[in-house]
Amino acid sequence: MKKFALPSYLNIPVVALLFAALVGCVSQPEGVKPVNNFELPRYLGKWYEIARLDHSFERGLSNVTAEYSLRDDGGVKVINRGYSAEEQTWDEAEGKAYFVNDSDHGFLKVSFFGPFYGSYIVFELDQDDYQFAFISGPDKSYLWFLSRTPNPPQALIDQFVAKAKALGFATDELIYVQHDNNAG
């Protein structure tokens, strides 16, 4: 399994400055509000990425999942995993997340790179069964639809697109993630 890696020609100070500028702040995009009555124990476990806006760290990946578990320090361990058909390898990144405010609000900060954190905002959630979640990052270029199943109903996908579009996300640029049993 290959870990997500930065190109070797980039040095740490340049990467640190760039990363801090891009996701160093923990902020909320205009109009995006975290859900209330968030229950972390129910959110933990495996989620399938159904749709996303494109970013280099996930480019070309299929079968993408996110797995959340408790850390010893009270935070959340995050393992993102996806399959690169081009390289025929699984890529994995491990991060950590902590609540920004109260633990009953779906607003966390997440880091995959040292001390730099970006927003992780759960702005829509199936609060009955915790079967789907709509996620934003620190601005409207970050958007994900997560589901407990790799093939949610089309009506739920349509609900995600409508909600995201109403909030000003570029839904015409969404990437729909392929999930199959043939990877790896």
Language-model features: locations:
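Bacterial N-terminal signal peptides that target proteins for export
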Residues: K2-V14
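A beta-rich soluble binding module of mature secreted/lumenal proteins
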Residues: F19-G184
